[in-house]
């Protein structure tokens, strides 16, 4: 997988408050993915290996999920996740998600558009 993170996807807008990862407790994250995508499972494994408690839901209508999440065209990828009020799109590294949660900026979330190489 190519490691060029386009995590400038701190998409401005909806101000949500978050709770930082505390006391080693696993942070819950809900991932929506296409049932036919193979790389989504690898990303879910990455999240679990980095302390996240992942719930995964297969969806045949990812376009609707992305639209309801308010994703800007061009920032989409193969899966969409929700964690503590933030939208996580694509193969965002777990450390970047943890930083987002710890710093709790007024943002929609993080995005790594496109598919991994």
Segments (PLM) and residue ranges:
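Short active-site oxyanion
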Residues: 28-29, 51-54, 84-87
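Stable alpha-helical elements in mature extracytoplasmic
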Residues: 36, 43, 58-61, 93-97
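Conserved helix-turn-beta segment immediately C-terminal to the redox Cys motif
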Residues: 44-64
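Thiol/selenol-based redox catalytic cores and closely related redox-interacting motifs
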Residues: 68, 72-117
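Local sequence-structure signature of Cys/Sec-based thiol-disulfide redox active-site neighborhoods
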Residues: 22-50
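Bacterial N-terminal signal peptides
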Residues: 8-17
């Amino acid at each position: 997988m190519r490691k060029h993170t386009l995590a400038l996807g701190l998409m401005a807008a909806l101000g949500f408050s978050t709770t930082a990862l505390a006391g080693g407790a696993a942070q819950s994250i809900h991932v929506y993915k296409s049932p036919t995508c193979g790389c989504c499972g690898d990303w879910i494994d990455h999240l679990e290996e980095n302390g996240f408690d992942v719930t995964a839901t297969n969806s045949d209508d990812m376009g609707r999920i992305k639209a309801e999440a308010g994703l800007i065209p061009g920032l989409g990828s193969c899966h969409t996740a929700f964690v503590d009020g933030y939208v996580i799109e694509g193969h965002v590294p777990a450390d970047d998600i943890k930083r987002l949660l710890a710093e709790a900026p007024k943002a929609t979330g993080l995005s790594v558009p496109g598919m991994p190489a």
